[in-house]
Amino acid sequence: MGVTLEGQRKESIWVLMRRQRARRALVKKIMIRPRKSVEASRRPCRAIHRRVKTLKELVPNTKTSEGLDGLFRQTADYILALEMKVKVMQTMVQVLTETNCV
């Protein structure tokens, strides 16, 4: 630090730059969230892949489906087919119970 003619302190440019750098580091530390590790960012992806794999095991003939769109379409078709089978079975039960009672 130097002294001017008027007796006031004159700070060196290097001291000012060091303070500014320290302030920036502090602001950066406060304002920017720490980044998650690569492993943490892959966890949701792994969970999705595990669920897709489970869905492929549950729905028949999905090994050859084209992407998630095809898998979801085949799953929806499979659910509709199962619903129709349930309705047919319910109708058969009603018909058979009515004929046995009469």
UniProtKB/Swiss-Prot annotation:
This is Transcription factor UPBEAT1. The lineage of its organism: Eukaryota, Viridiplantae, Streptophyta, Embryophyta, Tracheophyta. Homodimer. It comes from the Eukaryota. Disruption phenotype: Enlargment of the meristem and longer root length. GO terms for biological process: cell differentiation; regulation of DNA-templated transcription; regulation of root development. Keywords: Differentiation, DNA-binding, Nucleus, Transcription, Transcription regulation. Residues 32-82 form the bHLH domain. Transcription factor that modulates the balance between cellular proliferation and differentiation in root growth. Does not act through cytokinin and auxin signaling, but by repressing peroxidase expression in the elongation zone. It is found in: Nucleus. GO terms for cellular component: nucleus. GO terms for molecular function: DNA-binding transcription factor activity; protein dimerization activity; transcription cis-regulatory region binding. Expressed in the root vascular tissue and in root hairs and lateral root caps. Detected at the protein level in all cell files in the elongation zone. CDD domains: bHLH_AtIBH1_like. Induction: Up-regulated by reactive oxygen species.
